[in-house]
UniProtKB/Swiss-Prot annotation:
Keywords of the record: ATP-binding, Isoprene biosynthesis, Kinase, Nucleotide-binding, Transferase
Active-site residue list: 11, 137
Organism: Lachnoclostridium phytofermentans (strain ATCC 700394 / DSM 18823 / ISDg)
Name of one Pfam family that matches: GHMP_kinases_N
Spans traversing the lipid bilayer: none
Protein name: 4-diphosphocytidyl-2-C-methyl-D-erythritol kinase
Lineage, highest ranks first: Bacteria, Bacillati, Bacillota, Clostridia, Lachnospirales
Catalytic activity as recorded in UniProt: 4-CDP-2-C-methyl-D-erythritol + ATP = 4-CDP-2-C-methyl-D-erythritol 2-phosphate + ADP + H(+)
Pathway: Isoprenoid biosynthesis; isopentenyl diphosphate biosynthesis via DXP pathway; isopentenyl diphosphate from 1-deoxy-D-xylulose 5-phosphate: step 3/6
SUPFAM superfamilies in the cross-refs: GHMP Kinase, C-terminal domain, Ribosomal protein S5 domain 2-like
One of the protein's GO biological processes: isopentenyl diphosphate biosynthetic process, methylerythritol 4-phosphate pathway
Listed NCBIfam families: ispE, PRK14608.1
Taxonomy, superkingdom: Bacteria
Length: 291
């Protein structure tokens, strides 16, 4: 095998809670993570030249060490003492800086692909331990599916597949700094924390309506204050028949869950021809863990 193509799937947070802050600045979280069928495509080809070369369809993306795919390649080369270089084509579809772990998923797929290409025989657990060096979301992006995420995001408990539904993704054209959101999050006795345990129970019972009623994200209190259009999108999606709508991660992406295909498609078509059309997607949950 001298070339490999992989799909790097996006994630949403069905629930996101922040428990507290560590002395080192990291935050302890409890999250329900869900992979969706929106993906980037990554093609990797080893080269005799030792350099790492990345080509992408987005002109503004860095193709050097500031790209997490490059960093993943460098980590893999150094860990397994590989002299070959890599040519990588990265076709982005997941919105960038959107709270959907697009970069982390690209890094995860890269590690998985290199493990296959060079037959380094690393288990999923081995790759996850390697991946956490790149970012807290990378281990989950290797695991995929439905999972409870704790610690700083690296402690993962796989859950049964969440009840499937139609998932409409809308990303408004604003930029959100994850660092800014966490730094400005105020946790006190008035903080409304998600019912994570209740959502786990709803998922285990395959109760879509109960699960949808419990979607919640403490980071909304920061991001929506600075970008009120997120709240407007949520309310509008509810008026289109969504069971619920929520900001994913630190934002600004909003997802809406539908149990009715026609309602989901109607909302999708309306948004597709509107100002958010380029960053609007209708998808479903992803269950399989195969790349």
């Amino acid at each position: 095998m001298d070339i490999i193509s992989l799909k790097a799937y996006a994630k949403i947070n069905l629930a996101l809670d922040v428990i507290g802050k560590r002395p080192n600045g990291y935050h302890d979280v409890r999250m329900i993570m869900q992979t969706i069928k929106l993906y980037d495509k990554i093609t990797i080809k080893p080269t005799t030249n030792p350099d790492i070369t990345i080509k992408t369809n987005l002109h503004f993306l860095p193709t050097n060490e500031n790209n997490i795919v490059y960093t993943a390649c460098k980590l893999f080369k150094d860990t397994f003492q590989i002299s070959d270089g890599f040519y990588i084509n990265l076709e982005k579809r997941i919105p960038v800086a959107a709270g959907m772990a697009g970069g982390s998923s690209d890094a995860a797929a890269t590690l998985f692909g290199l493990n296959e290409l060079f037959q380094t025989n690393q288990s999923l657990e081995d790759l996850m331990k390697l991946g956490v060096k790149l970012g807290a979301d990378v281990p989950y992006c290797l695991l995929r599916g439905t999972a409870l995420s704790e610690g700083i995001g690296e402690v993962l408990t796989p859950l049964p597949p969440a009840p499937n539904c139609y998932c409409l993704i809308v990303k408004p054209p604003v930029s959100v700094s994850t660092k800014f959101v966490y730094e400005n999050l105020k946790l006190d006795e008035n903080t409304k924390h998600p019912n994570i345990d209740g959502m786990v129970e709803a998922i285990e019972k395959q109760d879509l309506h109960q699960m949808s009623s419990l979607v919640s994200n403490v980071l909304e209190s920061v991001t929506i204050k600075h970008h009120p259009e997120i709240e407007r999108i949520k309310m509008d999606l509810l008026s289109h028949g969504a069971l619920n709508a929520l900001m994913s991660g630190s934002g600004p992406t909003v997802f809406a869950l539908f149990d009715n295909q026609k309602a989901a498609e109607r909302a999708f078509y309306e948004y597709k021809v509107g100002p958010y059309g380029k960053q609007t997607f209708l998808t479903r949950f992803f269950e399989s863990k195969n790349v």
